[in-house]
Every structure is written in structure tokens, then in C-alpha cells.
Amino acid sequence: LKENNFLVWKDQVEDFELRVKFRLEGGNSGIYYHAQKRRPGPTQGDPLTGTQADFDASGRWTGVIMEYLLRDVLAERGQKVVIDEQGKKQVVGSVGDPAELLKAVKAGDWNESTVIARGGHVVLKINGVIMCELEDRDPKRLVHGWLAVQVHIGPPMRVQFKDIYLRRL
């Protein structure tokens, strides 16, 4: 791949609960939400931008909420984060030890990612275990957009998705 590829759902979402089963062999993938199309021109490998519930074979990015090419990592695995009205990020607590949380993920097997987004509050779970939690009060945050699943550029990989469930809140 020359740039990241996406399968994009036809409708946009704002407040929602999304459950997706995924299986990943190698590489990096994720679920974009509140995604926006990038402007024409160099995209640095990504035709979409948006908030992402990330996962990868190495485990480095699994259970992380980020905005690729925007505000970068918003909440690492294990963190409770508040982003204030001025866009300042502060870790305010923990949902668990990052290494212990990663043990909930079944490498190379089917896992279920759950994203619950209501207003600026986002909870990311994998296999029912909370990976991180974000309270984003920044008025510039993305509040609506498309849902998309990603195939990231990089080494050979295989990612599969099934049993996609969306509930608008």
C-alpha cells in the first residue's frame, strides 16, 4: 500500500456505541470515528483524519485513542485523560496497568473493540476491558463524522472485521 486504506460507512455519527470484532495478523489497524476527509495534497499516508481506536500486532498502539496528524495521542492504554477547554491534556487517573490490560487482547485471534462516544466522553474497551477513557472538552474537537476501519501502510499484514454493531446514543 502507498497510503492507508479505509472501508468507510455511508453515514456520519456523533454520539454512539460501536462494537466491532477484529482479527489482526501483523501490522497496524484501527477504527476511525468522527472521521473527516483530508484536503487535497500530501496526506502523509492517510486520506482521512479523525479520532481512532487503535490496535496493532506489537501491542504498542493497542487500546490507545489518537488523532493521527491532528492532536496525536489523546489517551494511552491505562490512562484516564481530560483535555480542557484550552486543549491542554492532563492524565487524571488510571483504568489499570498498561501491561496487564494488554493481556486481555488475544494476539492473532478474534477480539471485540467497543467505542462509546457521548459528547466529549469516550470509553475504549477491548474484550470488555476498559483500555482508556477520555473526557475531551476542547471546543475544537471533532464531534461528528464518518466511521471507518483502517488498513495501515507498513509490513505485510492481514486484518479482518466482523459482527459490526452500531447504536446511536
Regions found by a protein language model. Name each.
Residues 1-169:
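Carbohydrate-interacting regions of secretory-pathway proteins
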